[in-house]
Amino acid sequence: MDPEIKKYKKESQFKEIRRRFKKNRTAMLGLVLLCFILLIAICADIIVPYQKGIIQNGKDRFTSPNSSYLFGTDHLGRDLFARIIHGSRYSLFIGISTSLLALVIGGLIGSCCGYYGGAFDNAVMRFMDVLMSVPPVLLSLAVVAALGPNLRNLLIAITISCLPGTVRLVRSVVITVADNDYIEAARSYGGRDLRIILKYVVPNAMGPIIVSTTMSIASMILSAAGLSFIGMGVQPPSPEWGALLSEARANMFRAPYLLYIPGVCILLTALSFNLVGDGLRDALDPKLKD
């Protein structure tokens, strides 16, 4: 095929996907909300200095939201607005990094299983079946309990809990793509396996994988918040949203805003990723739309 025609077809496909996505109002709402949250995380130091979130002021303990403290203060007199703004970095970093790690590791394993099959595929998938038999939250708890509660171990635990689903998804998509005639043609011309996988298999399998990864970020953020809430994730005084909820438990009746505000932030962030993921799914394959 002429390179110019091939380039035109790719551009046309991209424009069609973008058009479908832009027509989806809920997806656009999710995208706007997500961009707003990402902008807050990126510009956190410009919006409010981090020091305001760690300075303790005993005189201003449990101050309700007002003009001086937009979100009020906590039990140590720390500015909750500053802690929420800078906490967005923790939650987004955990959600995005764990999803990308699971995608890279799970994508590599799943691609090899789907492309080669055989004994390697059987052995890996039986191991993944064992991991999937354990609920993701319990698996994460077990890993954190074994390694210790901190940010690094939380990332490891959530990535491991996400791996089985990623491996199975990538494997199933790669098996479907690998059965196409152009893959057999590439093999018959003596193409190396790595080149075939990277040039033909991966690009044609990216649609479902991108959608799944986008939507998994929301699950990862919720998992991290849940583990931090029970003291098995990010530890205080780090302002991760789940850790903020954990700190607020003891004073939930005296200062309920300490629970409501981080909870709403977690909800809106997870919702934005889910809406964008749904929109991408419908744009990439309109047949999947309900």
Predicted regions and their residues:
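Transmembrane alpha-helices
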Residues: 89-105, 140, 194-226, 273
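Generic hydrophobic transmembrane alpha-helix motif, especially the helices
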Residues: 70, 74, 80, 104-108, ...
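Glycine-rich helix-loop "coupling/hinge" segments at transmembrane-helix boundaries
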Residues: 144-146, 158, 173-174, 222-265
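Short hydrophobic alpha-helical segments within the ABC transporter permease transmembrane module
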Residues: 83-85, 92, 127, 134, ...
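Gly/Trp-centered helix-boundary motif
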Residues: 1-107, 111, 118-119, 133, ...
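Short helix-capping/hinge motifs at transmembrane helix termini and TM-loop junctions
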Residues: 44-52, 114-118, 143-149, 161, ...
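Residue-level hotspots within pore-lining transmembrane alpha-helices
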Residues: 89, 131, 135, 144-148, ...
